[in-house]
Amino acid sequence: MKRKRIAGVCIALAAVVLAGTFAVSGNNTKDKNHVEIINVSYDPTREFYEEYNKIFADYWKEEIGQSVDVIQSHGGSGKQALEISNGLPADVATLALEYDIDAIQNAGLIDNGWINEYPDDSAPYTSTIVFLVRKGNPKNIHDWDDLTKDGVGVITPNPKTSGGARWNYMAAWAYANEKYNGNETEMKAFIKKLYKNVLVLDSGARGATTSFVENGQGDVLIAWENEAFLSVRDNPDDYEIVTPGISILAQPSVAVVDENVKKHDNADVAKAYLKYLYSDEAQELIAENYYRPVNQTILKKHADTFDLNVKLTTIKDFGGWDEVQKKHFADGGVFDEIYEE
């Protein structure tokens, strides 16, 4: 399986360039008329935050009288967490899972208890994992079993660098857990067979979408639900979505990077930026961008968009992210075991 390409060779160089840009931008001086914040996020949130930044800027201008500019950075969630820990001057981190926020906390940049700063464990939107297939579903892909069949090319990112990829993997693991009644020998064999069909491990979810949609690789993309919807919206004649029989409740997490906002003197706007994600206006925008709002009233308004009956497991069913990371994605973990053989 080592023959497969693992994408992302240029990530480190790109990060150096970004860090240089942010080093100039991140030195906020107090200005009663203008403020700037840096949002370091994961791959498929680009379109949402481009729109959200506009409505937040309008809100902040009306409430405080300050104009606000938001600089965005996007990439694989695990990689982004590492870059922040290594000096990328994010004011807020909006990443794919709580483990990546914890990694920044462990680097001394985020205060303890961040998960309780905002409602719903500081997860203002959720998602799940689905399959994006080519129009007409020529390989008859309906559930996780079909991804292990001979001749099926699978595209999914690398769980070493991508938070979405870890959700993908754990959704497959949840299916295997149910199918094999918790027999880990059989579960590992199933996951190994699935990853044997993976053609390329891109560094992030957007790179995986590019491989599937723009480069025409593979028969099925394991994807964030919102990313799959965007692909169908933009290419309705080319793709369709398949919801597997079991998936996982994916909970992206948000946090203020406390040490950085102290340096930049912009804690008030950074905290408000995350708090406003829970407003009705932002929750509607979240749904329009195919994330699942945590406001249940607004979620139900969009029931025609989302499959609200899909069986969703949670990461807590597997002991939480600390245990999952250690068991599956740390060096020498289950993923290394099944992928490197």
Q: What are these language model-derived features?
A:
Residues 180-244:
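Ligand-binding pocket segment of bilobal, Venus flytrap-like solute-binding proteins
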Residues 44-47, 77-80, 98-102, 136-139, ...:
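Solvent-exposed loop/turn segments at secondary-structure junctions
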Residues 7-8, 21-107, 117-118, 224:
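Early extracytoplasmic/lumenal segment of secretory-pathway proteins
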Residues 35-39, 83, 90, 118, ...:
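Second-shell loop/turn segments in exported
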